[in-house]
Amino acid sequence: MKSNNLLLKKLSKHKPLVCLTANNTFIAKILDNFCDIILVGDSLGMVVYGEKTTQKVSIDMMINHGIAVRRGIKKSLLVVDMPRGTYEKSSSLALKNAKKIKKLTKCDALKLEGGSKISKTIKILVRNKIPVMSHIGLQPQKISNYKKYKVLGRLIKEEKKIINDLKSVEQAGSFSVVLESVTENLANKVNKISKIPVIGIGASNKCDGQILVTEDLLGLLNKSPKFAKNYENLKSKIAKAVKKYSRDVIKRNFPSKNYTYT
C-alpha cells in the first residue's frame, strides 16, 4: 500500500482493500469480519429511504445510521459520508458539521465528494484532526438525476480534471480517495501517480481497493449499475420466504405447535 498514514497501519499492505457500505448494526457486524473499511454512505438515501438520488440525505440521517453501524464494528475502519449541503458553502460550516458527525458517530474518518474546489476545506479538517477520505470522478451529490450518471475519462478534459483533483486532495491531506465511474485506462493512470490508496467503484481492478453498495452486492435492488456485480439474489430469496409465510398464515399452518407456548 502506498500510504504510511496512521489510519491505514492496521490495514494490510499486501492485498487490495476490501470496502463495503453499511447502514445498520446487523449488516455492520457481518461486514466487520471481511472488510478493511466500512462506509456509511449517503447512498442510504436511495437504498433505505427510496429517494432517486443522494441529494436529500440529511446530516441527521447520516448520524443516526453512523451510530448504528458503529455498534456493529470492532476492527474495520469506519468512514461516514458528509451529505450534500454540509460542507460546500464554507470551510467553517464544514468543520462545524464534521466535528458533530465525528463526535456523535465515533467514526474514524469522513468522506467528502470533490477535488480542487474543496481542497481548502480538506486542509482545515485535517488540521483539526479529522481524517478525510476524498471522492473524485463521478460525484453523485452533484447529479440530480441518476440517469445522467456517466463514465468519465474518455475525454482529455475529463482526464485532466480528475488527475488535478487527485493531486489537490493529496496535497490537502486526504488519507485515501474513492475513484468512481472512470475508464480502466484512467484508473490505471490515477493509481500509478497517486501517493494515497485509491479505492475504486466502477474504476476497474487497477485500484488499491474496491467498494460497492452492499445492497447491490446482495442483489436487493431492482437495478444495479454495470460495475456492481450481484454476488447473491437476496431479493428473490426474501420474496420466496415471505410467500411461504403468507401461505402458512392463510392456511393456519403457522404458528404450529413447535412455535406455540403451552
Summary of predicted features, one role per range:
Residues 1-232, 236-262:
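Alpha/beta enzyme core
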